[in-house]
Amino acid sequence: MRILISNDDGVNAPGLVALHAALADYAECVVIAPDQDKSGASSSLTLDRPLHPHTLANGFISLNGTPTDCVHLGIHGLLENQPDMVVSGINLGANLGDDVLYSGTVAAALEGRFLQRPSFAFSFLSRQPDNLATAAHYARLLVEAHEQLDLPPRTVLNVNIPNLPLEHIRGIQLTRLGHRARAAAPVKVVDPRGRAGYWIAAAGDVEDGGAGTDFHAVIQGYVSITPLQLDRTYQDGFSSLNTWLEGLR
C-alpha cells in the first residue's frame, strides 16, 4: 500500500507531520505538499509557470504549487511508484459546510478521486495543535478501515475532528454539509503609499447547522464524515429546467 499525502497548510505544517507519523507504519507514505500556505486554493491548477519539486531533509517533497498540483503531479509522473490512495490534511481549521468549495485540503482529495484513487480529507477544528493527536488517531483508524469499504465511484470522504482529547470524543457520525451565512464584506486597507487594498473577510456564521449536519456533529463532540461527490449535476432540477427551456423554443 502506497499513500500520497498532501495538504493546503504547507509542507512544514504540524498537521501534515502528524498525519505522516500516524500512517507511516501502516503504509509506504510519500508527502508532496505546497511550499507555502495555500489555504483557500480550491481545485486550482498552476498553468502559468513550471512546477519545481524539491526534496527536503525529512524526505517530504515541497512543490511551488497548489494542493491539486501536488496530487496531480504525484500521480502523473513525479513518483516512480504510483500511490494507491490519497490522504489530505490534517488541516488546522475546520472544513465544514460551504467551506468545501474553497478548501485546498478537500480539493487535494477530490483530485485524487478524480484520478481514480480512494481519497480522504481530514480537518481539525482548531488553528492550534493542542489536541492534534486526536485527529491523527482518527485519520489512522479511518484510513485502515477503508479496506473494508467499497467507496462509491467519484466520492471522497470529508472528515472533521473536534478539538477535544481523545477520551472526550463521543463517536463518529455520517453527516450532510451544513450551510454558512454570507461572509462579511472584504476589509479595505490603505498602505503607507496611499494605495487601497482588500483583505478577504472571515467565513460567515453557521446558518444551517441542525441535526444531521457536519456542524452539529462536531459541536456535539462527534467526528463528522461527509461523503462528497465529484459530480455536481443537480438532477432534481431537470424537470423545472426542462419546462423553462420548452418555453424558450
Curated annotation (Swiss-Prot):
Its EC number is 3.1.3.5. Pfam families: SurE (PF01975). It is found in: Cytoplasm. GO terms for cellular component: cytoplasm. The keyword Hydrolase applies. One of its GO terms (molecular function) is metal ion binding. A divalent metal cation binds at D8, D9, S39, N91. Belongs to the SurE nucleotidase family. This is 5'-nucleotidase SurE. It comes from Pseudomonas savastanoi pv. phaseolicola (strain 1448A / Race 6) (Pseudomonas syringae pv. phaseolicola (strain 1448A / Race 6)). The lineage of its organism: Bacteria, Pseudomonadati, Pseudomonadota, Gammaproteobacteria, Pseudomonadales.
